[in-house]
Curated annotation (Swiss-Prot):
HAMAP family: tRNA_dimethyltr_TRM1
Species: Methanococcus aeolicus (strain ATCC BAA-1280 / DSM 17508 / OCM 812 / Nankai-3)
Identification of the protein by name: tRNA (guanine(26)-N(2))-dimethyltransferase
KW tRNA-binding (keyword) present: yes
Function field: Dimethylates a single guanine residue at position 26 of a number of tRNAs using S-adenosyl-L-methionine as donor of the methyl groups.
UniProt domain Trm1 methyltransferase: residue ranges: 2-368
SUPFAM superfamilies: S-adenosyl-L-methionine-dependent methyltransferases (SSF53335)
Record-linked InterPro entries: SAM-dependent_MTases_sf, Trm1, TRM1_arc_bac, tRNA_met_Trm1_C
Length: 375
């Protein structure tokens, strides 16, 4: 075992974790950025929707890193109080270590239980303000229980999926089984939109609408934060934002859910904005003030810039140039050129070779031809 500090929280963790389902105790150092973003987004949400009491559940707690950071670093009642955290895990070794870590940080606002995640969530119907599902693989086995355990208005469902190849379209049949959706291959933004769409459909049967406030595809995982909205009308509004997408040589064709599916289209995808701009701006400020990882700030800033261009999909410049057999312009030069043509453009957080823009594919191709001709 060794001791580290993550954020403002001390943790005792395994010396050599292999990061697999077979680990006796699960701690993933790569996910520090994930946890930095999580604390920042939830704190930003708390700043907007402050309460006298706030209950959070981390039902797949592992060593307790995520739940204990929530307990130690989140503030309620305008900074005078702390939330109540429930951490669960089915692994007794993980529970013992989480308890040690709670003592290490002198936390008395944490309840640590040895229990299956679905059992823990099912025993706490409509109790939690936040439920954070962070499994090894797909979140779908826990999603129904999680939705039923969250308050139906102004709660947050936080969800990680590490089966990115499934969401990314490499395993079509598995995606249909796990997410009841047909994936398009090779687009990380659409992987996020597919996960969000699945959660919206799951929540709608309980007359709960889900509205994404922040989402990202970083490293080996997809992560999303969804706010609950109460009532059949809100559920219907969320479902109406789902639809189908078709990709023809990097041009995205969109069809609404009401138009129905047809050959070549995949989905259902969430087709509206994935980001709450105000919550994200505040989260960036929080992360900077607390000296969280530079990478977490970078991800949030880029996601914020993407949110200002509210459309579906992005352009992979390398793929476009390969299709038209032209030289690849530097991304910064391409974005400047599009700006001069009157379009908005920014980098994406998930692919250094792609941009998000309100330009059409033909406009981007036109610039690439001019760039190639001048070389």
């Amino acid at each position: 075992m060794k001791y580290i500090t993550e954020g403002n929280t001390k943790l005792k963790i395994p010396e050599d974790a292999t990061i697999s389902k077979k680990d006796k105790i699960f701690y993933n150092p790569i996910m520090e950025v994930n946890r930095d973003i999580s604390v920042s987004i939830v704190q930003s949400f708390l700043n907007k929707y402050d309460r006298d009491e706030f209950f959070i559940c981390d039902p797949l707690g592992g060593s307790g890193a995520r739940g204990l950071r929530y307990a130690n670093e989140l503030k309620i009642n305008s900074g005078t109080g702390a939330p109540h955290i429930t951490i669960g895990d089915i692994n007794p070794n993980a529970i013992s270590l989480a308890q040690e870590n709670a003592k290490l940080n002198n936390l008395n606002n944490v309840n640590i239980v040895h229990k299956d995640a679905n059992v823990l969530l099912s025993e706490n119907f409509r109790k939690f303000n936040v439920v954070d599902i962070d499994p090894f693989g797909a979140p779908s086995p826990y999603l129904d229980s999680a939705i039923r355990s969250i308050i139906t208005k102004n709660g947050i469902l936080c969800m990680t999926a590490t089966d990115t190849a499934v969401l990314y379209g490499s395993y079509r049949k598995t995606c249909i089984r796990n997410y009841d959706a047909t994936p398009l291959k090779g687009n990380k933004e659409l992987a996020i939109r597919l996960l969000v769409g699945h959660a919206i459909r799951m929540a709608s049967k309980y007359d709960i609408g889900l509205k994404p406030i922040f989402s990202h595809f970083t490293a080996h995982y997809v992560r999303t934060f969804l706010m609950t909205e109460r009532g059949a009308k809100k559920a219907d509004e969320a479902v109406d934002k789902l639809g189908y997408v078709k990709n023809i040589e990097e041009e995205y064709i969109i069809k609404s859910r009401k138009e129905g599916n047809s050959d070549g289209f995949c989905g259902l995808y969430y087709l509206d904005n994935l980001t709450d701009e105000n919550i994200t701006k505040d989260a960036i400020k929080i992360a900077e003030e607390r000296n969280y990882s530079k990478e977490s700030v970078k991800v949030m800033k880029t996601v914020y810039e993407e949110s200002l261009i509210n459309n579906v999909g992005c352009y992979d410049v390398h793929k476009i140039c390969k299709n038209i057999k032209k030289k690849v312009p530097p991304v910064d030069i391409l974005m400047s050129g599009l700006n001069e043509m009157g379009f908005n453009a920014c980098r994406t957080h998930h692919n250094p070779h792609s941009i998000k823009s309100d330009a059409k594919l033909i406009d981007i191709v036109e610039f690439i031809y001019k760039y190639d001709g001048n070389k």
